[in-house]
Amino acid sequence: MKASYSAYDFTKSRERIDEILKGADADYQNKDSIPSRDDLTFTNGFNVRCSALFVDIRGSKAINDKHTKPVLAKIYKTYISELVAIMRNHPKVNEISIEGDCVWGIFDTPYQIDIDDVFEVAYRISSLIDVLNIKLRKRNYSELTVGIGASYGSSLLIKSGYKGSGINEVVWLGTLVSEAAKLCGYGNKLWLITKSWFRMCFMTT
């Protein structure tokens, strides 16, 4: 997020710290579905059940070492562009984040069919990489190998940043995203899903 200079005020800093720390535990509610971001303040939060999907390129250092910067830009732009497009196709996508060559999304999945649709997103991404690699191969560019990880569970949704500055972000705390990232680390080796997701998908009646 873009930022500009602002003098630090120690007194106001203490006031902001006290305002957050004195907040009541009741301000952090449990939700089965992701609430509106308009409901978030700097002093509340929501413990939400949802799904995370994490995609990351394997061996990106070798790709970076092989190609010129313009070629790298083309490879990454096409990869990221179409991952975002596919994730947005989920009817209940809530957030998409891009960090380097990693793209991850949060999905509101209160019902079984919503979770099934997240699996479909993963399948489409896998197919997309196959198509993209055909096009990269024709240009003698490095082909991409990616890991895909998915997790279902609880995440603490908060609004974090500097109050009044316009610099703030929605942050997803807890193990949900890191668990999806860990599963992504096994990418292109085998399919792995979390125990809670297995129960949701295969043990419901």
What are these regions (language model features)?
Residues D27-N30, V48-L53, L72, H90-I96, ...:
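Short, functional N-terminal and low-complexity linear motifs
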